[in-house]
């Protein structure tokens, strides 16, 4: 099951007692800040959580899986996420008994 923005807003509403509309706007604003920073070419560091980085990938050869035809995969910029040590530790601890 995936955590959605709506569920995050609902959690803010329940734990902080703020208006649902305000909670939704807070969640949207948070992600908009991250999007804006990445669009500007900035790294996003969330202490205790992880880092969002931009990585340039070079053009490389590829293959159309349907036809088998060789086609170039164009150069592009991708977003990567590297979890912080605190997040890694908590996830490992949560999954240790499974």
From Swiss-Prot:
A Pfam cross-reference name: Bac_DNA_binding
Gene Ontology molecular function terms on file: DNA binding; structural constituent of chromatin
PROSITE patterns on file: HISTONE_LIKE
GO cellular component term, pick one: cytosol
GO-annotated biological processes: DNA recombination; positive regulation of metabolic process; regulation of DNA-templated transcription; regulation of translation
Keywords: DNA recombination, DNA-binding, Transcription, Transcription regulation, Translation regulation
Region of interest: Disordered: 49-71
Origin superkingdom: Bacteria
Family: Belongs to the bacterial histone-like protein family.
Assembly behavior: Heterodimer of an alpha and a beta chain.
Function: This protein is one of the two subunits of integration host factor, a specific DNA-binding protein that functions in genetic recombination as well as in transcriptional and translational control.
PANTHER family per record: DNA-BINDING PROTEIN HU (PTHR33175), INTEGRATION HOST FACTOR SUBUNIT ALPHA (PTHR33175:SF2)
Name the record gives this protein: Integration host factor subunit alpha
Native source organism of the sequence: Shewanella sp. (strain ANA-3)
